[in-house]
Amino acid sequence: MKKSITTLDLNLLLCLQLLMQERSVTKAAKRMNVTPSAVSKSLAKLRAWFDDPLFVNSPLGLTPTPLMVSMEQNLAEWMQMSNLLLDKPHHQTPRGLKFELAAESPLMMIMLNALSKRLYQRYPQATIKLRNWDYDSLDAITRGEVDIGFSGRESHPRSRELLSSLPLAIDYEVLFSDVPCVWLRKDHPALHEKWDLDTFLRYPHISICWEQSDTWALDNVLQELGRERTIAMSLPEFEQSLFMAAQPDNLLLATAPRYCQYYNQLHQLPLVALPLPFDVSQQKKLEVPFTLLWHKRNSHNPKIVWLRETIKNLYASMA
């Protein structure tokens, strides 16, 4: 006997699609911002409605049954049509599009012109609001004041800025990973010395105040070695540290992400980049995963999905 769609909770179809994509109850639950138990209950309802197991457990995760495989394309088309329907209001001029970008202003400046052009092509009357990433930015995403954040996180096990430490309500995608390097003027005396940890620590440093902290993973690695750097100046932005390091007769060293080379070339600063004088395991702790962040409630918002994809494409073109 044919069943009526009125007897099916359509929210269950979203759950079904995510299960098909993730092949995992736990991962589907994370994307839906619910507990695995809730997803298991939804799967039980779907099995009863379709009178089919839909998925069976295997060492590789959930394996779809033949019925589920046969429905995959139809389900994807149904979800696409649903998104088009929900996108109708978003084709009206959106107000106050907000981008939350990393504190590293060079990262913002590298993409701002290209991003704004693409955004105005899609939404000609939209507005763009940019703010620097700071200690309150994750809360701003949670409060709905920011659509998307773009922030460098940290990899050191002792860091408070690990991806695994993000609030459960925040979804993310790593766009690229960077390893910081040392920036110094082209005629800096350190360039005439053996480049090692002693030379690195012999000169004064510029530190960046990151989310209300003057220290970061670099200082953690040095502490593990029983060493520390002399911080002569603290600044809020990386581009300011590059500018100061480039000044004539300045002995200051700036440590900033490698991507700052784009900013360097743009402004023709007389700087040279050297690798941090650490071994491979220590360098690994200093990796910075640059990450798009958004609230889970926006994971399927067509405007936000488009924005994420646009930013991803911009950075892919830079690689």
Swiss-Prot record:
Underlying gene: yidZ
Family per record: Belongs to the LysR transcriptional regulatory family.
Presence of keyword Transcription: yes
Entry-linked InterPro entries: LysR-type_TF (IPR050389), LysR_subst-bd (IPR005119), Tscrpt_reg_HTH_LysR (IPR000847), Tscrpt_reg_YidZ (IPR023746), WH-like_DNA-bd_sf (IPR036388), WH_DNA-bd_sf (IPR036390), YidZ_PBP2 (IPR037402)
Organism: Shigella dysenteriae serotype 1 (strain Sd197)
Chain residues forming the annotated DNA-binding region: 25-44
GO MF term set: DNA binding; DNA-binding transcription factor activity
Alphabetical keyword list: DNA-binding, Transcription, Transcription regulation
Protein name per the record: HTH-type transcriptional regulator YidZ
Task performed by this protein: Involved in anaerobic NO protection.
Statement: the UniProt record of this protein carries the keyword Transcription regulation: yes
HTH lysR-type domain: residues covered: 8-65
Alphabetized HAMAP family for the sequence: HTH_type_YidZ
Source organism, top-level taxon: Bacteria
